[in-house]
């Protein structure tokens, strides 16, 4: 079906961990191994459908044992990267999530993300980072603070929205509401800025076609088709502004 559709596809393994509670930086070795086995099954599926990339996320952690969790994450990531390489040429990405709002993942703030990416890239040149506009406010960073330090490691860019002003607001946290959702953080202006920074750091350089994708979902009884149209209009208007400015 994908071949007939003339589409490129990447495999998101994040739900494999989020829906099961498995954690690849689990300090319990049995738990870490279960998470790894789950992701390896995902790698096999990804190759089966001809995916060009495979993405996952880090797990929750205890602040008092943060360094141990980091070491466990590095160990797991290297195992996944080696497994992927043993099967073919698929790229591997870790998606950067919030560390204290919703997913509460280890990776994370830009300084730790950079340290992590450097460590993995030493041995695995097919590894990179997936950044997400919707997660940047949740990490309490600006676009520049989040992207500039890791510019050399970005291999996938998500565009999305979030609500974080108050925990009792609809769609609070990492819920990916449509652009312009009440009390949300991102709309056309923020997408414009995100695209401009991606251009400045060379991710969108006009020479290659890197992955840029949306992550949005309906809230409540919203019509999915209308939310998809919302995302397309947002990107079209934002890109038109970027082109005018350049």
Regions found by a protein language model. Give the residues of each.
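N-terminal pre-domain/capping segments
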Residues: 1-48, 123-126, 229-246
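Active-site acidic/histidine proton-transfer and metal-coordination neighborhood
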Residues: 24-128
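Histidine-acidic metal/acid-base catalytic patches
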Residues: 50-52, 82, 111-128, 137-246
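Short acidic/His/Gly/Ser-rich catalytic and metal-binding motifs that mark active-site loops
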Residues: 17-21, 56, 165-171
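Conserved, mostly hydrophobic/aromatic
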Residues: 2, 35, 46, 113, ...
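Active-site-proximal loop/turn and secondary-structure-junction residues that shape catalytic pockets
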Residues: 15-17, 58-62, 96-100, 133-137, ...
